[in-house]
């Protein structure tokens, strides 16, 4: 049995960063990864990087003289080449640390300090003083007759490897993941249909913003089937056949590819956490405290697996929290990192930090609200996409920014300016009067916050 100070399960953003940090301190560390295809974690291999590469390629589609099929296949092949390089670079960076050993295999707890690692028929055991779980999450597949991932039925992770151009694509779910893929494939030339049980997209967002998103997608030619309950799925050599009901009426749809985008679930089943006495939530995520410790103080959970926001930058921040604790400070915890922004690469990009208007009113705030159509922003005209809406929510009692939603080109960059203002508790007037360079999307913050009354 191998005995080490630290065992990390999962080669994600937090896990790989922590492995190098501990190794550089001279602490013997083992990092276990189930699949060599996942060195570096979800973001690099099957998430942010490949999806945004394809989204960027889709945006450039009009500049190519290739057929849709040729252009799409070349984009996928280029994506695969990039991911292979990043995967190898991530492995090499960790494996080159003299105090870190990378083990390929499936890790499962034998007891609260011992983990078995299975690689084919070989089984080894590792005893560690501290264990850090960074196994992430995976796409959730709802229970529908015939719904099995295969040649023509995909998750967000498998669709990006499809080299054959789909002339038609149905997407189950109108959340951010489904909408991201809908935009990319519509721009590649695919006929896209989104199926959702709800009666509108993005129900958690403010209605005025959601309406702008819907209009933008309809402008791309994306069809929406709201109030649609999927009954059955079948696939053959040429198509996927979907049976669904709308208002009690049974309907059929056949497409060349089908994407299931109905959320994500924790990768914890194979860990045998019960053997370690580690508690999980009803959804399978590991319960943690503000220092990311489980109910077993020497077992930590970082990244998506602990049930927090599923973004790679949160996984990196989880590393900072654990590092603070291990350095005997513990001064930086989950409680100190608000506010956290997010961006979804829709058409155009959707970004938000803090509260929506709906959330602010539900919490009882007295608020001021300002909106700005993206058509009023000069840089949007230059970029060739004037779709979108900026929206700000301000506390009427102290002029603090409660939340901002930016639906517009380059919002993933602009939102970080707002985050900094909120973190440093600046009044909204700072952004109303800030001198910005011109022409930029950021300068529209002058007009947005200048409209706060």
What are these regions (language model features)?
Residues 9-37, 42, 49, 53-54, ...:
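Flexible, glycine-rich terminal cap/loop adjacent to redox cofactors
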Residues 2-4, 21-27, 33-165, 193, ...:
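Glycine-rich flavin
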Residues 149-165, 252-329:
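FAD-site-proximal beta/loop scaffold in flavoenzymes
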Residues 48, 135-191, 195, 223-224, ...:
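Glycine-rich dinucleotide-binding loop and its adjacent helix/turn
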Residues 1-12, 165-175:
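Beta1/beta-strand and adjacent pyrophosphate-binding region of the FAD-binding site
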Residues 15, 175-178, 315:
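Catalytic nucleophile loop
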Residues 7-9, 107, 126-136, 172, ...:
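Short hydrophobic core segments
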Residues 118-124, 230, 244-252, 264:
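A structured beta-alpha segment of the ubiquitous adenosine-cofactor-binding alpha/beta core
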